[in-house]
Amino acid sequence: MAVVIRLLGLPFIAGPVDIRHFFKGLTIPDGGVHIIGGKVGEAFIIFATDEDARRAISRSGGFIKDSSVELFLSSKVEMQKTIEMKRTARVGRGRPGSGASGVGNVYHFSDALKEEESYSGYGSSVNRDAGFHTNGTGLDLRPRKTRPLKAENPYLFLRGLPYLVNEDDVRVFFSGLCVDGVILLKHHDGRNNGDAIVKFASCVDASGGLKCHRSFMGSRFIEVMQGSEQQWIEFGGTATEGGDTPRMRSEEHSPSRRINGRHFRKRSHSKSPRARSRSPLGFYVHLKNLSLNTNKRDLRNLFRDTDLTNDQIKFVYKDERRTRYAFVMFKNQKDYNTALGLHKTVLQYRPVLIDPVSRKEMVRIIECYEKKRPESLEKERPGRVSQKYSQEGFSGSGQKLCIYIRNLPFDVTKGEVQKFFADFSLVEDDIYLLCDDKGVGLGEALVRFKSEEQAMKAERLNRQRFLGIEVLLRLISEEQMQEFGVKSSWLSNERTQACSRSHDGDDCSCLFDLKDPSSCSFGQSESLRYHPKDLRKMGHFKHPQGYFRQSDRRSPEDFRHSPEDYRHPWEEHTSHSREEDWRLPLEDWKWSQEDDFRQCHEKDRRQLRSPWEEDFRRPSQEHFRRSYQEHIRQPPEEHFRRSREEDFRHVADEDFRQASDEDFRTSQEDLRYPTDEDFRRVSVEDLREVPEKDLRLPKNFRSPGEEFWTPPDFRGQHPFGNFDHLQGGKFDFEKYKFGSFPDAKVTSDLNLNCVSDKIIPVKISNLPFKANASEILDFFHGYKVIPDSVSLQYNEQGLPIGEAIVAMTNYNEALAAVKDLSGRPVGPRKVKLSLL
């Protein structure tokens, strides 16, 4: 049900748009605003529902155009009587020389009022949303002494149009008449204000248009009055070609004149002087906050309702780089007002600020930004690219083709960075991973793109989460990239390939200058001569292809000393095979570490002697270009024909005291892949709990006649401990077999006191209830976690209890994860890690 509200205190300059804005959020039907004006600033507003009216009354005391307004509950009868009284007062005063025409207008208005009441939902008696004129007085701004029956010129002025009207609606309103052009007037914000000026083909057509005065367009009656050519030109139209328009023109020439005039209006500038422009600033606008990717085509699409070409658009440059400013020149005030109405329109995710500007101010701004010449700019830049490099393929010094990435994991690889920029065609030569003088990753990288456009698109990935961490991106130039010690791939391609071959496929994962020791970790053979203590600190520097840890390899200088000099005091227990931890007493072991290499045949010794014995004093660079697998060639197959059970039976027959040479031959499994676990030094933690009195047979050791090895399905006793508490979880250890994990290694020894090579479960407590397996894997990034081993724990009702269990590949990784990650947050909670 419609409810009428009476408003008092409306300012003189306020209109229906201001009233609707004041009641923003409430439903006011089309034609529901009726401005009476007068000394008290009276108006009536119709609301669609009682709830809207109640909320509107609560806004009493608000401000419209800095004027306080009061709201009262009214009715349709009161509104209608007030409008009738206002009309009667206007007719009673009369206009000079109006005569009976004024009475006719009153009767015409009454008939229109009755006709509208017959189908109107709320009996409005005035033109909807037009009311009387928007000045609030109800008086015409251009009063005329008498209403002419014939038009003086082909221009008519319309008032009271609906706000959503277009040119076609106006032509339909004047159906049967030749309309030459229509200009809809707008507010400063680009919205229609309900006025328009129409140009007809002749004065005869204009006289016919005057007869449409107070005719209805939809639910509104339109006021039609005589206009002028000056108004037409002032509002963006073009002057008539060939001087003044004749008063009378034959109707048979009207269609051709209409067509020519319409085309002429679109293709020509106004011949009127600039002094006639309503805007003192001219037809120039200043665009701010533009995206750097915006081009002239985008601006033409933004101002699609205007007549705009590329020559009218000017982008502002500073130091040969695009800024976020631009200037646009319009040909008429109509397009100018339309452009100003698009203020703060979003273009390419940025709100564009459109401000009016004068020609003088525009020229001053352009000269201020572009006063420096390119020659002077090149002299000012200390890091400019030389002409030689430019001829070899360098882009312009002003282009920013590189991205500087920070906050990456320290062991990130090029392949992972490529996945982050999956939408861009990058190769590994375009990615540079930064590392310190010891080769440890800094968690930073440089990426070069083929074009500046791709680099700017890639910069949009700033603050995106990558490998569980929010990375930071910054666009830099190639000169800034070279300050990091990085040279472009096409300038040092040969040097880069030599560096890549020297450490088995880009081992250092970065392409720095080889002459800079702080930039290259493994570029020359000298970088391999680190002390073993330094090499152990680089355990997390991963090989990009085989995940082979360079830091775990021993330097050739380790073999220059005798075994007695090389061994540390704590290594006395580890100089023999791990099998002898439970076979022989420590004092019965007679062979040194060097004798292990003498058990092989002479043919095998020649294969192993070249890199380890003969050339260890002066290792050439060729030995480091080949992979370590090439140095250790696979021995003949007859060395592996004997099973391990036969070896143990042979030792048992001799009472564990006279072991033959065959027992300590290097096994096939140890020579299969030289992984990091094969050359790993036994840590103090592994030997901390190995006393001499504990060198006894393990519980699960079987006699020589029995089957020694654990069945492949692991359905018997669990070799890793008791996992009965995992029955409520998802992780099933039965499906995980030795060798099924690429990072896990099953050793060939039986030293069960050292569990560093066993799968160790880690329990995570105080997890968020909504945590999933992916978040847990991101939390353990950088640690050797079996991907499919994440087991979220649930209660009997199937709800998560905030706990999970993951499996680590060895004891050292599990212990390091517990020490480093315990107390770290996962979401809003700090989790607690413990070994099981």
Curated annotation (Swiss-Prot):
Q: Which residues carry this modification: N6-acetyllysine?
A: 758
Task: Return the Basic and acidic residues bias intervals.
Answer: 244-255, 550-572
Phosphoserine: residues bearing it:
703
User: Which cysteines form disulfides?
Assistant: none
Q: Which UniProt keywords apply?
A: Acetylation, Phosphoprotein, Repeat, RNA-binding
Mention any Pfam family matching this sequence. Answer: RRM_1
Question: Start and end of every RRM domain?
Answer: 154-229, 283-359, 401-478, 760-836
* Matching PANTHER family: HETEROGENEOUS NUCLEAR RIBONUCLEOPROTEIN-RELATED (PTHR13976)
State what protein this is by name: RNA-binding protein 12B-A
Source organism of the structure: Mus musculus (Mouse)
